[in-house]
Structure formats: structure tokens, C-alpha cells
Amino acid sequence: MPDSADAPEEVPEFVDIVLEDDRWEDADLPAMAERAARAVGEWLGLDAFQVVVMGCDDARIAALNAEFRGKPKPTNVLSWPAVEFEAREPGAHPEPPGAEELGDIAISYDTCLREAEAQGKPFADHATHLLVHAMLHLAGYDHIDDEDAETMEDAERSILGKLGIPDPYLEHET
């Protein structure tokens, strides 16, 4: 019987995946989302948390966008935090969330692909950026005003840089 000290350490999964569009399976959304979640967790100083990510198409995300934001059109990504965050000074980092469940994310394959092609970016890099962006929203970041946008974009650049993904806010040739 092996010693429990010799047993491999169990690595927690951060992401539950719901695939409503099979193209996300081909793109390996589960691995992309898990990689993004681990990087966000490390950056936030969180050992474990849970996020639900739904990979869908433009029709589904347009319906969700209409229902929750009153905008009946497709968008790239939507997020629903599990907890409400206290107001903070503009540009300040939010307190790391204490909840184990951060919230839910929906990401549209169609819009993600269109944007990646228009910006001359690899699909996986763009999708990973959108997942990181949404996970930061779940952790209390936003980009409503310029100072908060700068703070959030700096966080995204830092996290994506550790993943080897170039700055998503640089101009790209098409």
C-alpha cells in the first residue's frame, strides 16, 4: 500500500463547462478555460474557486444579452458574479473574493471567431483573453470609468503575459 505522502497531489478543477455549441469542443474550451482560471487565481492569490463557463453561439448569447442587459444582439462574452462587490475608489483593485463560487460566464464562438479574424489574432489567444476578462469581472473588476478600465486592462496584460499571450490592446494588422 503506497504511503499517502507518495500519492500525487490532487489538483482542483476551477471550471465547470457547459457546451451548447460543438465547435467549442473542437477548440478545446475546457482546457482554455481551466488555463485561464488557474492564471487568474494565481494572480488574485486564490488557491481554489469555481466558475461555470458556457460555450455557445451568437443566437444563444444574443438571447442572454437581451434578457440580462436589455441588448438583443450578440456579444463576445457575458458574466454573472456570484456575489455583489462593495463600491471602491476608481482605479483601485477590488478585494479578492471570499466566495468559492465566483459566478458564471457565457462566451460566443461566432463573435469570438469574427473578432479574432478581424484583429489578426489566433482564436485561442482571443478566447483566452475574453475568459480572463470575464473572470476578472467575476472577481469585482470593471471598466465603466477610465481609471477602472486601466486597472482591469493592466491586470489582463499581466495575466495573459504569464500565459505567453501578447497584449490584446495593441493595434493589430488585419
Curated annotation (Swiss-Prot):
Entry function: Single strand-specific metallo-endoribonuclease involved in late-stage 70S ribosome quality control and in maturation of the 3' terminus of the 16S rRNA.
Protein location: Cytoplasm
Provenance organism: Paracoccus denitrificans (strain Pd 1222)
Family to which this protein belongs: Belongs to the endoribonuclease YbeY family.
Keyword annotations: Cytoplasm, Endonuclease, Hydrolase, Metal-binding, Nuclease, Ribosome biogenesis, rRNA processing, Zinc
Domain of life: Bacteria
Catalytic EC class: hydrolase
Keyword Nuclease tagged: yes
Cofactor annotation remark: Binds 1 zinc ion.
Protein's name according to its UniProt entry: Endoribonuclease YbeY
GO cellular component: cytoplasm
UniProt key word Metal-binding: yes
Originating gene: ybeY
MF annotations from Gene Ontology: metalloendopeptidase activity; RNA endonuclease activity; zinc ion binding
Cofactor(s) needed: Zn(2+)
